[in-house]
Amino acid sequence: MIDLAILIILSLCVLAGYYRGTIYAAINTGVTVLALLIALLMIPAAAGVIKHSDRLYKGMLYYFEGYEYVSATSVEQVHTPANAVSDGDLKTIVNNANMPIPMGDAVQKNIRRLAYQEKGIVTLGDYFNQTIVDVVINILSMFGIFVVLRLIMGWTLRIIDSSFEGFPVMNRYDAVFSCGIGFLHGVLLVYTLFLLVPVALTVVPRLETFLNESLLGGFFYHVNPLLHLIPMT
């Protein structure tokens, strides 16, 4: 099912590229890249709005339980001070937790540099919980900003295209280049959609079973460069 959905998205992007031509397809892909870059830069501002809403932020801290990831190794470790955990023990705890990407790496880095010390966060369980919530907020912020920007930019591009009665088309190999660019655009869009996978897995861990059964889904999740650009705090 996941593979089919991905193939449909890629096919639609290839067809759109073929129909619109190489120049339009290239500009359209560039617009998506630009929207992603702006969304990435605006994460701190957007996430800050959510974090300054005590009711919403505390609600998320309550809902996204990070303690259970620690208890997968030992319940007693939940209340262990983060600075008292060795690198080896921390690696074991994170491996046993089987956390969504990039939660595991984010937790390890935040604990090693005591990122939340100024907030009074001390225990291992609280570090897991806080990191998960912050990463989720950052992902949702980036995705939401991207969607809004992409819709506005796409609508603007359509108006420009209509005003000039379409962008020029290459005399030779236009179909080949336009389809290729359309495919790359589709890959980029799928990567963007898969930003939501860690959030979904945090809420419903059993979804990982369906993801592991998907060849394309597993690829776009495990080999997703966008996930590693998400801020850790």
Regions found by a protein language model. Give the residues of each.
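Alpha-helical transmembrane segments and their juxtamembrane interface "caps"
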Residues: 1-233
